[in-house]
Amino acid sequence: MTNWINTVSRDHVERGVRGRFTQANHGKPHMLRKMSRGDWIVFYSPKTAYPDGEPLQAFTAIGQVADDEPYQVEVAPDFQPWRRNVDFLDCAETPIRPLLDDLEFIEDKARWGYKFRFGVFRIDDHDLEVIRSAMVTPTAHIAGT
């Protein structure tokens, strides 16, 4: 299994949680094709809304990829994004700053936001566990069950 971070504004994350899906890189399929069923995906939201929301800098959702291939949907005639289904866990929005020292994927703690410019990227098991334990309560279950 692979662990991923997807950088997405909170309003878009909330839509995905309600619909039990994720998109990446403004609906492009490339990174979604690299994901496999069972992969963990953590959502980091730099802002509350895209494009002009307030700064947030928090992890806003976590779940596992629940399908085998990306699929395309029509949101509007000129926008047909690619998606993956996700089984989301119940979790608490978690500010990133208290976790910075423990996250190994952030090599330069002074410029910690740089990595998120890539949109979607892999993290190791240690970093997933740091984030998951901060976000998920002991009684967490798959959202919507």
Swiss-Prot record:
* Ranges in a coiled coil: none
A Pfam match is EVE
- Please name the HAMAP family in this protein's record: UPF0310
Q: Which family does it belong to?
A: Belongs to the UPF0310 family.
Q: Could you identify this protein by its name?
A: UPF0310 protein Mvan_0064
What is the source species?
Mycolicibacterium vanbaalenii (strain DSM 7251 / JCM 13017 / BCRC 16820 / KCTC 9966 / NRRL B-24157 / PYR-1) (Mycobacterium vanbaalenii)
